[in-house]
Amino acid sequence: MAGRRCPQDSVRPLAVAVAVATLAMSAVACGPKSPDFQSILSTSPTTSAVSTTTEVPVPLWKYLESVGVTGEPVAPSSLTDLTVSIPTPPGWAPMKNPNITPNTEMIAKGESYPTAMLMVFKLHRDFDIAEALKHGTADARLSTNFTELDSSTADFNGFPSSMIQGSYDLHGRRLHTWNRIVFPTGAGQAALPGAAHHHESGQRGRQARFRHRGDHRRIRRRGKVIVRTVGAQLSEQLTRIEFPQCSSHGLA
């Protein structure tokens, strides 16, 4: 994407849109490839990142709240320069859940997993992006019996980003999760999209996508974007977010 970028050490006190998408499905091993998905498949108690550290991870939302950042959920379609959406793959359909906050977009394959969810939040007030990224993986690490597969703090298409994937227990199921947070920065305002992809063990990963409408080279980066993704496979139409598949990473 093209456009001017603000200094990455802070965000101006302008609007920030946050989108979060989640896909849930089962993790399955299919070969001795790297990264080692076999290590995250067991449902027996494991030593998580939380138990091996002296400090409990602080979720991103809690960190932002602690530094005075305020915000509210908004519809993904309300973003102007940046459009974030989840196309519906074959066999998937929109899913309604009364327990999910308004303005949340959610699709599912069947009545449970896998699912993909997209949420957008508008944030206000200056804050340190680099410091915020340190909290981008906390939600995943705090999941029950979470076992990390891999993680990264490399930029995503030139944007500050934090990614983590692994597995955790939920209601008697072992879920694979893939989580990425991205802060696209620029002039004028900030947008923070997040995606999460979950799938239950024993099922084949499916693909969903985030789309930027129009030529992504014409989209000006404004403020920051947080992208959170969990499990399976998500991608953007123009700026792709790849999720593991058996052919390349050991998942069926």
UniProtKB/Swiss-Prot annotation:
Signal peptide boundaries: 1-29
InterPro entries: Lipoprotein_LpqN/LpqT-like
Lipidation (S-diacylglycerol cysteine): 30
Gene3D superfamilies, A to Z: Mog1/PsbP, alpha/beta/alpha sandwich
Covalent lipid sites (N-palmitoyl cysteine): 30
UniProt membrane topology term: Lipid-anchor
Predominant location: membrane
S-S bonds: none
Entry protein name: Putative lipoprotein LpqT
Native source organism of the sequence: Mycobacterium bovis (strain ATCC BAA-935 / AF2122/97)
Gene it is expressed from: lpqT
